A protein has these predicted regions:
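Conserved acetyl-CoA-binding loop-helix of GNAT-fold acetyltransferases
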Residues: 70-83, 108-109
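Short glycine/proline-centered loop/turn elements that form peptide/ligand docking sites
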Residues: 78, 101-103, 120-126
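Conserved GNAT acetyl-CoA-binding A-motif
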Residues: 85-98
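Conserved catalytic-core motifs of GNAT/GCN5-like acyltransferases
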Residues: 94-96, 113-128
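Short beta-strand-to-coil "C-cap" segments at the C-terminal boundary of structured domains/repeats
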Residues: 129-136
């Protein structure tokens, strides 16, 4: 089940998300910018976002640990996030993935299109992807 992360989830989320500081993670959870997929109180995946140009939802992290991949966890997190962003009135969302990562294929499968790239010093080329979301 997908839900917004709670304060009590932070220690488990931190195991998966090492890209931000604990203070940043706590703020993201407080600001309701972190989702968790839980089954039997076990976190099987996370999604965390911020805002590009302070106005476009940008999915910074979609992570499903080995053992939980290919079971619909990532799809559930992505769809829940997109629906939440649409409900909040956004008409497009962004994400990014490194060019050598498989994630780009996952996002394209769900309607994301390349809109640009950045050279991430030493890490390689980062692809920026966009998806238009519609109000129903």
């Amino acid at each position: 089940m997908v839900a917004y992360a709670l304060k009590g989830d932070i220690p488990d989320i931190e195991v998966f998300d090492k890209r931000i500081t604990m203070a940043m993670l706590e703020k993201a959870v407080f600001d309701r910018r972190v989702l968790v997929f839980k089954a039997a109180d076990i976190i099987m995946g996370i999604a965390r976002w911020n805002y590009f140009w302070d106005s476009i939802p940008f999915l910074n992290m979609l992570y499903v640990p080995d053992g939980y991949t290919h079971h619909g966890v990532g799809i559930a997190l992505l769809r829940f996030w997109e629906e939440e962003m649409e409900t909040q009135g956004y008409t497009r969302v962004f994400t990014a993935t490194m060019s050598q990562e498989r994630g780009q294929h996952f996002f394209r499968k769900f309607g994301y299109c390349d809109i640009g790239n950045l050279y991430n010093d030493g890490a390689g080329l980062e692809l920026i992807l966009e998806k238009k979301i519609q109000m129903n």
